[in-house]
Amino acid sequence: DVADPSIIRIDQTYYITGTSSEWAPYYPVFTSTDLVNWQQTGHVFDEKPEWTKSSFWAPEWYYHNDKVYVYYTARKKSNNTSYIGVATSDSPTGKFKDHGPVVEFGTEAIDAFILEDKGDLYISWKAYGLDNRPIELLASKLTPDGLKLTGKPFSLLRDDERAGMEGQHWFKKNGYYYLIYAINGCCGPNSDYAVAVA
């Protein structure tokens, strides 16, 4: 059971990681060459990063310039707010170096996803989930090394219907940008969970 999974392929090997919540070590890593048989090969972090407290959710792989990035959600020790951190390694199964928070925005910033467009890196996230206002899926340009925000965050989509959007993925194909995201309630006999596209 790997909630909030993220998968990448490097050469002929697939790597998957996902939410570990409060369980240490943090963010398990599994590998496969056929997408059927998987073997756990380690974790992103053996110990929690210095700035974090709990709620280790939704890690997102990204491979850029021969470097493996993982953007992850965790609660910050100093204020108990969920933010997005980033760590890098030369390999998905190698030792990751944590670079601390990359998105510290409002009362919640979760569910990172990376888009590369015309050589520039962008990060998207869910915001305002704990505020008395509609959730928004926000984005911002990243520095070329992928470790810091640059420029002003901008809105991708606003949840005016209050459907609980989160877990967004965005990509570009044939000149169009697509945003895929989860809405409605998850789990149980009355679940109305759905996936939407914009």
Describe each model-derived feature in a short phrase.
Residues 1-198:
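Carbohydrate-active catalytic/glycan-binding domains of CAZyme proteins
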